[in-house]
Amino acid sequence: MPLSNRSTLTQYLIEERRRFPGASGELNALILDVSLACKAIARAVAFGELGDALGDAAAMPTGGAVNVQGEVQKKLDVLSNEVFIRRNEWSGSLAGMASEEMETPYQIPGQYPRGKYLLVFDPLDGSSNIDVNVSVGSIFSILRAPQDVIDSGRDVTEADFLQPGAAQVAAGYALYGPTTMLMLTVGNGVAGFTLNPTLGEFMLTHANVTVPADTREFAINASNARFWEPPVKRYVDECLAGATGPRGKDFNMRWIASMVAEAHRILMRGGVFMYPRDTKDASKPGRLRLLYEANPIGMLMEQAGGRASTGRQPMLGVKPTSLHQRIGLVFGSKNEVERIERYHHEPVTREFATPLFAERSLFRD
């Protein structure tokens, strides 16, 4: 499509707003501020070592080394978090923010007006890959603040953010790869925008994104196989058995270790992603964070006709219990996710209680 015929992100949001004549435009303004933050991060990522942005945050003058998750921070983690805060705190759209990189909610400074939305984000997902030039991204979720927060203007608390994924009013991610893309839902399907570096604008390039219901691809970190629960072992075992196994078809396995990149591949061509609950660490019933990773990706998948789940229940129905709560996550092509859910609810047979890489392993020589 010629450039002149493509909508900008701003035009797209205006068209969406027209569906609701009483809308104030405050949500549109917030999404545009988020997109501006993503543009700034995309530029920093693109410069890499030339911009002195690679390496651990411990080398920065401001210090920083380990975040609230106990993870070593990269320079770009710290920079990206700061960009999100500075680009979004001033506009009057937000009552507060929460981030993977901050232990407690961020209060909007007193010199700025406060609004009716909450912004939750992972400023740089997959940052462990940044030093080896693998695609990374930013994930965000927008919630409506509780009415008493809006009415009183009080400081937000952790409890204000503990809303199920179904309460999200918008969600999306930016992918910093060969091109920078923004995938967005405002509750009316999923649209994809590509950053035009000449104009500095996100242009609509993927309208009405749909995840195929069936697939021949799955993504999982097979190094954790010994910790998987039996339903996950069963599913992977059957996929690996290929055309001669119970599924009657061959599957490909993918693993990038960057959830934004995995989610983008699935939105573009289908597939299923699994980072399930396992027995590796009993204190962590999952690896990914519910509020700013699982929920926004889950909303995108559901809006694109896919499915997101814990493996046992729909992801968007989970009631959060803490700001940085971890959870098992399965998302992608609807029929595959539903199969995995079904396996979790069926009785465990002795056959699939056997570790995948033990004597029955399909990897056995």
Swiss-Prot record:
Protein EC: 3.1.3.11
Family annotation (SUPFAM superfamilies): Carbohydrate phosphatase
Enzyme class: hydrolase
InterPro entries: FBPase_C_dom, FBPase_class-1, FBPase_N, FBPtase, Fructose_bisphosphatase_AS
Cofactor note text: Binds 2 magnesium ions per subunit.
Record keywords: Carbohydrate metabolism, Cytoplasm, Hydrolase, Magnesium, Metal-binding
Positions bound to Mg(2+) 2: D122, D125, E293
Positions contributing to substrate binding: D125, G126, S127, S128, N221
One biological process term in Gene Ontology: sucrose biosynthetic process
Gene Ontology cellular component terms for the protein in this record: cytosol
Cellular location(s): Cytoplasm
Catalysed reactions listed for this entry: beta-D-fructose 1,6-bisphosphate + H2O = beta-D-fructose 6-phosphate + phosphate
Top-level taxon: Bacteria
Subunit structure and binding partners: Homotetramer.
PANTHER family from the UniProt entry: FRUCTOSE-1,6-BISPHOSPHATASE-RELATED, SEDOHEPTULOSE-1,7-BISPHOSPHATASE, CHLOROPLASTIC
Family: Belongs to the FBPase class 1 family.
Protein name, UniProt field: Fructose-1,6-bisphosphatase class 1 2
